[in-house]
Amino acid sequence: MKFMEIEKTNRMNALFEFYAALLTDKQMNYIELYYADDYSLAEIAEEFQVSRQAVYDNIKRTEKLLEDYEMKLHMYSDYVVRSQIFDEILNKYPEDAYLKEKIAILTSIDNRE
């Protein structure tokens, strides 16, 4: 797999984690099988008894939808920035128990389902 493909796969998996609840069941199934489980278009088409083209079209529409959600809501990009700031604070003040505790609380908020 090429670097750009890996990067896109990682991004789609991350966006899926944040916005899966906004997708239909079919969109969730196709994206999860394609990106997370590494199914081919043909394998997904066979499993759902549809054409490869139907799977391809659905995945492309869902990718655009996930990107649109991110453009409007910024949940993933905000999470990345928060994580970077937390890391910087912990690196600058590694012995500060108060900061560690507060960052742990904020991190648990980010990671709750």
UniProtKB/Swiss-Prot annotation:
Record Gene3D superfamilies: Winged helix-like DNA-binding domain superfamily/Winged helix DNA-binding domain (1.10.10.10)
Pfam families per the UniProt record, alphabetical: UPF0122
InterPro entries assigned to the protein according to its UniProt record, in alphabetical order: RNA_pol_sigma_r3/r4-like, UPF0122, UPF0122_fam_protein, WH-like_DNA-bd_sf
Stated family: Belongs to the UPF0122 family.
Role played: Might take part in the signal recognition particle (SRP) pathway. This is inferred from the conservation of its genetic proximity to ftsY/ffh. May be a regulatory protein.
Official protein name in the record: UPF0122 protein SSU05_0875
